[in-house]
Regions:
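Extended, solvent-exposed polar beta/coil surface segments
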Residues: 1-26, 656-659, 694-710
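Alpha-helix initiation and N-capping motif
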Residues: 129-132, 220-224, 247, 295, ...
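Solvent-exposed soluble domains appended to multi-pass membrane proteins
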Residues: 259-265, 273-276, 281-710
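Serine-centered coil/turn micro-motif
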Residues: 14-15, 25, 222, 353, ...
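Short, well-ordered coil↔helix boundary/capping segments
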Residues: 99-102, 126-129, 221-226, 468-478, ...
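Transmembrane and membrane-interface helices of multi-pass
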Residues: 2-217, 666-668
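Membrane-interface segments at or immediately adjacent to transmembrane helices
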Residues: 194-273
């Protein structure tokens, strides 16, 4: 032990104890030279950092060289941004320390981007920082592994220790800062130059102000600029023609053409919208061949019911943004680079959606999703959109997972959807279903033994395994579609279902790989039991539900009516300008289209359909265990004693167990459904007062042993 302490003391003396040291004249001349030409060295270092970051992001030295060659001016502009950040060192005496911090900042961001791109197509952006707590809190997913988390923690820890040592023992500028005012003025000039040079670069097409393809944008214009734009370019820009009169003109145009709704919450059909996670028809991929059709139900519905291509705003990731467009009718093209409105504007602003529109005519509105309720801040977002209920995985008795163990299977969503219908027998329902079974990452090692569906046309063995896994999961999604439509066919209720892929899978697909020629095109299909005619159309995600409701006689809401009356206009520019105007007015403007009032306030969202209750509590006769009996417990049911959570074990949907030492006679017991970050989504309908059998009472409590099936 003494030797260990001796070693630690040596390290401490070497790294963290500053000793005066006499340097040679040559050393001081070198320092003076570096200080004199520091701007030149900053420029060189800035270019080196940008090049290294591009190597990391592209995971290829050759690709980084091609970027510099093909987009030289963009490379220089990225370097200029890093160069400006280095000018901050002139405000400090410990300039070497400041340079290391700035270098580390950009390099760490580049490393994070490289790690992100190894698991998805969409690069790392500012909004991802807000998702990190939720990602880290998720279990049974492939967003983060224990190994990755360990590397990140140790890497940051080592860098922090190095910074401490450098701060203590590193060089310090000893010259007189005689021109502090000039330095600050020079620094201010550089930072003021950023928006000016950015505007020039955008106007000359050196870089772009909007990325229709985020991944391609990062490739073409560099990580430093692209990430920086996600930091400063958030929200919507105010349209130049935004004013009350122009908004009223758009509204008047819509009102003169819109139709009258012919149904209500008692006579209208049930509407089901299904987001099929990462769903892609294998027939759409030019190089891929499958031994037999893995999605026969999908193709049968595509043949017999209305269907078409769906233009979505993301590829490989970003489900929430396709979802946002589909539910609200608003377009992501007017937001900042890589933005998630769920994580920004919807944090504080309510937003008209299909749910609030249908609620106005008496519909009950629901969301069913077999993943965490907090992910993408969905619980908040669905409330802001006006939904009545949200059944997330925390409210489901999930027992089955996909072959790689990452995601719950989707079959449970059928019964959960039927619960939403049964809960409102005298109302029509809108139920939005979000699947996860086909979610990436797709393993490059064989996972499924003797797979039913095999692929060819893929040379790389790892990618062949990934495609094999994916097409077999597509078959599971197809089975879900059949089970859902079969179950709906048994019910004597008019129903229309629209199903769509939110984006293509994370498989590195290019436009040339797709029959559509566009990696931003997925497919949608429909089903109904009402005899509606087949009317195929290619749509944008923000038009999908306007089209669906139009076919069943529902013409509600500012945005949905706008699409229904204007989406087939021959003047595409006018159509997009009107959408931009209304979208800004609703989210960021004065809501002239609502006459300045809040027509669609946030709802009091209820988590889940099933009520959780406690029916009995008893002590074990053979161990220090207390059993809690009730209904609708799940793996996310947690026991609270006097409003404080205690360790508990899930035994079945009717039994939970806690340790005897955590409870005392007279304590109040509550069961809560708990999400990430200890968010309580729902509490049991009742509390139960614990009666300790070891304490004398007027009557004795039961001490029956539970069974696993209870």
């Amino acid at each position: 032990m003494k030797k260990i302490f001796d070693v630690l003391n040596v390290i401490k003396q070497k790294l963290f104890v500053k000793k005066d040291k006499i340097h040679s004249e040559k050393y001081y001349r070198r320092i003076d030279f570096l200080n004199k030409y520091s701007l030149l060295f900053h420029a060189i270092i800035a270019m080196a950092i940008v090049f290294i970051v591009e190597i990391i992001s592209r995971r290829s030295f050759i690709s980084a060289c091609k970027f510099v060659d093909a987009h030289t001016l963009a490379f220089m502009y990225n370097s200029f941004l890093v160069f400006v950040s280095f000018s901050l060192v002139y405000l400090f005496r410990r300039r070497a320390f400041a340079r290391v911090i700035i270098t580390g900042f950009w390099t760490i961001l580049g490393i994070i981007n490289g790690c992100v791109l190894s698991n998805r197509v969409t690069p790392f952006g500012y909004t991802d920082l807000k998702c990190i707590p939720e990602l880290l809190a998720m279990n049974n997913t492939s967003y983060f592994t224990a190994q990755q988390a360990t590397i990140v923690v140790f890497g940051l820890g080592a860098f922090a220790l190095f910074l401490v040592a450098l701060f203590i023992k590193g060089p310090k500028y000893t010259g007189k800062i005689r021109y502090a005012g000039i330095s600050v003025a020079f620094l201010a000039l550089l930072f003021v130059a950023i928006p000016v040079t950015t505007n020039v670069a955008q106007n000359t097409n050196v870089v772009a102000s909007y990325y229709s393809n985020i991944a391609q944008g990062y490739d073409d214009y560099g990580f430093v600029y692209s990430f920086s734009s996600t930091v400063v370019d958030r929200g919507m820009k105010k349209p130049e023609d935004y004013n009350k009169q122009n908004v009223e003109d758009v509204e008047q145009k819509v009102n003169s053409q819109k139709q009258t709704t012919t149904v209500d919450g008692k006579t209208g059909p049930n509407i089901i919208c299904v987001l099929l996670e990462s769903f892609c028809d294998p027939d759409e991929i030019n190089f891929l061949q499958v031994n037999e059709d893995p999605i026969p139900t999908f193709h049968e519905l595509e043949k017999n019911y209305s269907s078409g291509y769906l233009n979505v705003p993301v590829v490989g990731a970003g489900t929430a943004n396709t979802e946002f467009e589909m539910l609200t009718g608003l377009s992501m093209q007017y937001f900042g680079t890589g933005e998630y409105p769920y994580k920004t504007i919807l944090k504080q602003t309510d937003c008209e959606s299909i749910a609030s529109d249908l609620s106005k005519i008496g519909y009950a509105t629901h969301v069913v999703h077999n993943n965490g309720g907090n992910f993408y801040s969905r619980t908040n977002a669905f409330s802001k959109m006006g939904f009545d209920t949200f059944t997330s995985k925390e409210l489901m008795n999930i027992t089955e997972y996909t072959p790689n163990g990452s995601w719950p299977t989707d079959d449970i969503l059928v019964s959960e959807t039927m619960k939403t219908f049964d809960a409102t027998p005298n109302q029509s329902d809108f139920t939005y279903i979000i699947t996860v079974g086909t979610h990436g990452d797709y393993p490059k090692e064989p996972v499924i033994e003797n797979p039913t569906y095999t692929v060819s046309g893929v040379e790389d063995e790892g990618m062949k395994n990934a495609w094999t896994y994916y097409v077999n999961q597509l078959n599971e999604a197809d089975r879900f579609i059949k089970e859902l439509t079969d179950e709906l066919s048994k019910r004597d209720e008019d129903t229309i279902v629209v199903m769509f892929g939110d984006h293509l899978p994370t498989m590195g697909l290019q436009n040339s790989d797709m029959k559509s020629g566009d990696i931003y095109k997925t497919k949608y299909i429909t089903w109904n039991n009402m005899g509606l005619p087949k009317e195929d159309a290619d749509l944008y995600a923000y038009q999908l539900l306007a089209q669906t409701t139009d076919t069943v006689g529902i013409h509600e809401g500012t945005i949905m009516n706008y699409h229904q009356t204007q989406m087939n206009s021959t003047d595409e520019a006018s159509y997009q300008d009107g959408l931009d105007l209304l979208q800004y007015d609703i989210l960021y403007g004065k809501r002239y289209c609502y006459n300045g009032t809040d027509l669609y306030p946030a709802s009091d969202l209820v988590m889940g359909i099933d009520k959780v209750d406690i029916t009995n509590v008893s002590d074990s006769s053979t161990s220090d265990t207390v059993y809690i009996y009730g209904h609708n417990f799940t793996n996310w049911s947690k026991v609270y004693i006097n409003d404080s959570k205690v360790a508990s074990t899930y035994l079945s949907a009717g039994v939970l167990a806690i340790n005897k030492e955590d409870i005392s006679d007279g304590d109040e017991i509550t069961v809560c459904q708990v999400g990430s970050s200890d968010t309580i989504f729902r509490k049991s309908e009742n509390t139960y007062t614990y009666v300790d059998p070891a304490v004398e009472h007027d009557s004795e409590s039961e001490t029956d042993e539970p069974t696993e099936n209870q």
